[in-house]
């Protein structure tokens, strides 16, 4: 039996650092999305430590399929259209090259609106919720990046409630609203982004 000389955490860190080199706009994005998902999972108070760990790894590396600048241009827009390529490549990475084969659909569908995702019978409910948590955290991080200009951080919660139940599943929205991070999210998320790039 052969074991790697580094821990899972070190492998994730190595992959994240390499991924951050793809495009400067992605630096720290996965870490911030993972942090936001973590706050939602804490609010749910029903996940095992293994489930939390696995979902945080998926969240940190959710855009690992992105490597083309034109698609990254679309990914960093608030409204996501035509961003399937990176989701497909990320799905293939997780399905064929990691121990996350069963969770790979989370990456494939992390930009899929709830109205479409809920009708896909081949995907288990927990995987759909995980995809929605990453989707919501991803959009929130992009929103915070853009909101620097508009100074309207609190309007995101109203936005997602207005989109629900078409864009986001009600359970994900409820966890987002229950999560305890609004008071410090701006400072904490920016700090987290810096921590992974220094």
Can you annotate each of these PLM segments?
Residues 1-198:
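Histidine- and acidic-residue-rich, metal-dependent catalytic cores
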């Amino acid at each position: 039996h052969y074991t790697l000389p580094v821990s899972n955490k070190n492998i994730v860190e190595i992959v994240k650092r390499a991924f951050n080199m793809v495009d400067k706009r992605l630096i720290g994005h996965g870490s911030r999305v993972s942090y936001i998902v973590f706050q939602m999972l804490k609010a749910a108070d029903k996940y095992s430590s293994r489930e939390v760990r696995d979902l945080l790894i998926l969240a940190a590396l959710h855009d690992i399929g992105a490597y083309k600048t034109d698609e990254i241009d679309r990914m960093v827009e608030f409204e996501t259209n035509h961003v399937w390529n990176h989701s497909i490549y990320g799905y293939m990475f997780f399905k064929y090259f990691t121990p996350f084969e069963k969770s790979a659909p989370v990456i494939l569908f992390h930009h899929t609106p709830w109205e479409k995702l809920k009708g896909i019978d081949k995907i288990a409910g927990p995987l759909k919720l995980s995809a929605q948590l990453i989707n919501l955290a991803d959009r929130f991080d992009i929103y915070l990046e853009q909101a620097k200009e508009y100074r309207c951080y609190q309007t995101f919660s109203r936005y997602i409630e207005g989109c629900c139940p078409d864009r986001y599943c009600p359970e994900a929205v409820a966890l987002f609203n229950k999560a305890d991070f609004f008071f410090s999210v701006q400072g904490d998320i920016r700090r987290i982004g810096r921590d992974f790039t220094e």
